[in-house]
Structure formats: structure tokens, C-alpha cells
């Protein structure tokens, strides 16, 4: 998509959106994808989906409270990603893991960064 995927796949300060709750949740999504890469089983996949869905709910709640202008299109991107990851089964193929990593990196830096200072 555009931004480089970090190796090892870990959150770093370049992903900071400056809302502690959201930064902590982004870290947790990174960790959950990393966990699937290293222990490609149904439990880790379920945790990845749950952590991601919970984060999206929290982030969307903050956006809604702030009357964030791009809420609808942002929410749609979340929904589309959830459809993909909820459709996965373990073991997850390398192509799908790459997709999840790429999506997260580019979503945070390309989309989430647009709400910095607006929530």
C-alpha cells in the first residue's frame, strides 16, 4: 500500500497518534498479529480479531463523541477489515498475515493520523 512494514513487527513511536488509549490499543493489535505469526493457531487468531474489534469500537466512540468529519468512511474501512479477518481460519496463510500487517501499518499512518488533534 505505501508504508514499510516494520521487522520485527512491533509498534514504535512512528505509529503514535497521541491518544494514550488508542496508542495502547494499536500496540495490542501489533502484538496480536505478531502472536499469530509466531503461534499460528485458533486461540491467537481469535484474540487478534477480538483485540482489533474492541479497538475499532473504542476509536469509533471517540470519533463519534468528537463529531469527527470522516467518521463514516473511517468506520467503513474498519468494517471491511473485520470482514476479512473474521473470515480467516488457523493456520493463517503467509499472504493473509502480510495483508493484516500491511493493512494495519497503512491504516494507522495513512488514515488514523488524519484524526490527530481532532478527537
Curated annotation (Swiss-Prot):
Pfam hit, one: Hemerythrin
Entry GO MF terms: iron ion binding; oxygen carrier activity
Superkingdom of the source species: Eukaryota
Cited InterPro entries: Haemerythrin, Haemerythrin_Fe_BS, Hemerythrin, Hemerythrin-like, Hemerythrin-like_sf, Hemerythrin_metal-bd
Gene3D superfamilies: Hemerythrin-like (1.20.120.50)
Chain sites annotated for binding Fe cation 2: 59, 74, 78, 107, 112
SUPFAM superfamilies with a match to the protein in the record: Hemerythrin-like
PROSITE patterns: HEMERYTHRINS
Keywords from the UniProt entry: Iron, Metal-binding, Oxygen transport, Transport
Residues involved in Fe cation 1 binding: 26, 55, 59, 112
Family as reported in the entry's similarity comment: Belongs to the hemerythrin family.
Function description: Hemerythrin is a respiratory protein in blood cells of certain marine worms. The oxygen-binding site in each chain contains two iron atoms.
Protein name: Hemerythrin
Organism in which the protein naturally occurs: Paraleonnates uschakovi (Giant mud worm)
Amino acid at each position: 500500500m505505501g508504508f514499510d512494514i516494520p521487522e520485527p513487527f512491533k509498534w514504535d513511536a512512528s505509529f503514535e497518534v497521541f491518544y494514550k488509549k488508542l496508542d495502547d490499543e494499536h500496540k495490542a493489535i501489533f502484538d496480536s498479529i505478531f502472536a499469530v505469526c509466531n503461534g499460528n493457531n485458533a486461540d491467537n487468531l481469535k484474540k487478534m480479531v477480538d483485540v482489533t474489534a474492541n479497538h475499532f469500537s473504542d476509536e469509533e466512540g471517540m470519533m463519534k463523541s468528537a463529531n469527527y468529519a470522516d467518521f463514516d468512511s473511517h468506520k467503513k474501512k474498519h468494517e471491511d477489515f473485520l470482514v476479512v479477518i473474521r473470515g480467516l481460519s488457523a493456520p493463517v496463510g503467509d499472504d493473509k498475515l502480510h495483508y493484516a500487517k500491511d493493512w494495519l501499518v497503512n491504516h494507522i499512518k495513512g488514515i488514523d493520523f488524519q484524526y490527530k488533534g481532532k478527537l
